[in-house]
Amino acid sequence: MELMNIARVRWACRRGMLELDVLFQPFVDNVYQDLSDEDKVLFIRLLECEDPELFAWFMGHEVCPDPELARMVVQVRGRAAP
């Protein structure tokens, strides 16, 4: 996925779970453009994970085993809402 193609990133944020949509959509709308290219790549990697994993990480039921992705989870949770 292209880092600068915001439409594709927004589309990838559309998940099968409303709880994830509520986190990802505001993050993309309000924060994604200001991320470094490295963090954009990391966010896209996060979007490639399965919904049940993402749900568990974002709801705090499990800790993401990948430290880089875990950092992005914290960043999204902390900055998704305006």
UniProtKB/Swiss-Prot annotation:
Pfam families given in the database record: Sdh5 (PF03937)
Q: Which GO terms describe its biological process?
A: succinate metabolic process
- The protein here is known as FAD assembly factor SdhE
Asked whether the UniProt record includes Chaperone among its keywords, one would answer: yes
Arranged from A to Z, the UniProt key words for this protein are: Chaperone, Cytoplasm
A single Gene Ontology CC annotation of this entry is: cytoplasm
| Location in the cell | Cytoplasm
Family designation: Belongs to the SdhE FAD assembly factor family.
Q: Which organism is it from?
A: Shewanella oneidensis (strain ATCC 700550 / JCM 31522 / CIP 106686 / LMG 19005 / NCIMB 14063 / MR-1)
Functional summary from the UniProt entry: An FAD assembly protein, which accelerates covalent attachment of the cofactor into other proteins. Plays an essential role in the assembly of succinate dehydrogenase (SDH, respiratory complex II), an enzyme complex that is a component of both the tricarboxylic acid cycle and the electron transport chain, and which couples the oxidation of succinate to fumarate with the reduction of ubiquinone (coenzyme Q) to ubiquinol. Required for flavinylation (covalent attachment of FAD) of the flavoprotein subunit SdhA of SDH and other flavinylated proteins as well.
